[in-house]
Regions:
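C-terminal motif of bacterial Sec signal peptides marking the signal peptidase cleavage site
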Residues: 16-17
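Short helix-capping/linker turns of helical repeat alpha-solenoids
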Residues: 46, 51-54, 58, 65-68, ...
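Short coil/turn linking the two alpha-helices of tandem helical-hairpin repeats
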Residues: 67-77, 107, 111-116, 142-153, ...
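Structural signature of tandem alpha-helical TPR/SEL1-like repeats
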Residues: 80-90, 115-125, 152-162, 187-190
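TPR/TPR-like (Sel1-like) alpha-helical repeat modules
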Residues: 161, 165, 186-203, 223-228
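Terminal, low-structured helical/coil segments at or just beyond the last alpha-helical repeat
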Residues: 203-244, 331-339
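A contiguous, surface-oriented mixed alpha/beta subdomain in the mid-to-C-terminal portion of proteins
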Residues: 230-310
Length: 343
């Protein structure tokens, strides 16, 4: 589990194209016009996911199952879909009607396993998500059109259009690619503008050294124009928080479903949201193991209701920041501490 600033996925965007002649609308028109019902196959419940579950938990479980596949078989094993990948696919398909984010992940795992799934299935997932301004899917289309993938030939114009759109919608890797690509084309004003967006001092200085005063003025002007087109930082943060809550919910449910016993989906969301927000409050609270241990101990302290702020308890705090303890050891020692207090 990583802090939200390190998540790979920067997923929440706003529609910027307002008329048929806008660049965004032209990009949308280059994609198949398919509904969600047309692209989502029918799937059955599995041992982890059912259609009755809420989408937040379904998304989190899908991601956790993908991680489990990597642990069991290695990240490079993509020729065949494992049992875990097949279950993850079903979970993510169930989540898709409310979580367009899941389509980015679906496109990735399906597109990498072409012995089991059609290339068109993967492309349609990515295309639908990109039309709905998911920056992860827009970046995916840049990758597809850059080299030619999923039965689509290389197309430099489309590739660069999707790259620039993903960058505007907050995908940091795409923003870095805009700096690199613009610099390679000697388009230093554009490179400078994107370096300013990234707010990386070394990158800004590296580009500035290659620029004339006139180019600097053009770069500042382009940067000012970009500011009005970028997805607001607060919206990106809210979306990342939402994704991290889903990820943490699925992770906890997969490994320790007892954490959520007796909770409604709304109560579970509030419980996990508190854990996620503590990642920002306490710098030493940042590992997956800490989150799992925290959730388990919190339920020991208070069986119902919101998560308790264990960081205010010196003895429990000391346990949680002890890197030498496993989750199981941390919880066992916490039980001992709590039992002594009841005597």
């Amino acid at each position: 589990l990583k802090s939200r600033s390190l998540l790979p996925l920067a997923i929440f965007t706003l529609l910027l194209g307002c008329n048929a002649s806008s660049p965004d609308e032209k990009l949308n028109n280059s994609l198949p016009d398919l509904s969600l019902e047309q692209i989502l196959p029918k799937v059955e419940a599995n041992q982890y996911c059912t259609p009755e579950m809420d989408s937040e938990l379904l998304l989190g479980l899908g991601i956790r199952l993908i991680n489990e596949d990597e642990v069991l078989y290695g990240a490079g094993r993509t020729l065949l879909a494992s049992k875990e990948i097949k279950m993850a696919r079903s979970c993510l398909i169930m989540a898709a009607p409310r979580y367009t984010t899941s389509l980015c992940i679906l496109g990735s795992i399906v597109g990498a396993r072409q012995n089991d799934y059609d290339k068109s299935e993967a492309f349609n997932y990515i295309a639908y998500a990109a039309k709905h301004n998911e920056s992860c899917a827009e970046a995916g289309l840049y990758d597809i059109y850059s080299v030619g993938k999923l039965d689509h030939p290389p197309n430099k114009e489309l590739a660069m259009g999707w790259l620039e759109r993903a960058a505007r919608h907050g995908d940091q890797e795409s923003q870095q690619d805009m700096v690199r690509w613009s610099s390679e084309q000697d388009n230093f004003p554009v490179a400078y503008a994107w370096a300013r967006v990234l707010n990386e001092a070394k990158t800004i200085e590296a580009v500035k050294r290659k620029m004339s005063p006139r180019q600097m003025a053009e770069g500042e002007q382009h940067y000012t124009q970009l500011l009005s087109q970028l997805t607001p930082e607060k919206d990106i943060e809210q979306a990342l928080r939402k994704d991290l809550i889903a990820l943490s919910s699925g992770d906890l449910y997969y490994s320790h479903p007892e954490v959520f016993e007796g909770m409604s989906p709304m109560q579970r969301h509030a419980f996990v949201a508190q854990l996620v927000d503590m990642l920002d409050l306490y710098p030493k609270f940042h590992t997956r193991g800490q989150v799992v241990a925290y959730a388990l101990i919190s339920r020991l302290v208070q069986s119902t209701g919101p998560a308790v702020d264990l960081w205010q308890d010196p003895a429990l705090h000391a346990l949680l920041i002890d890197d030498d303890l496993s989750v199981e050891d941390t919880v066992t020692k916490a039980k001992t501490i709590l039992a002594k207090r009841k005597q």
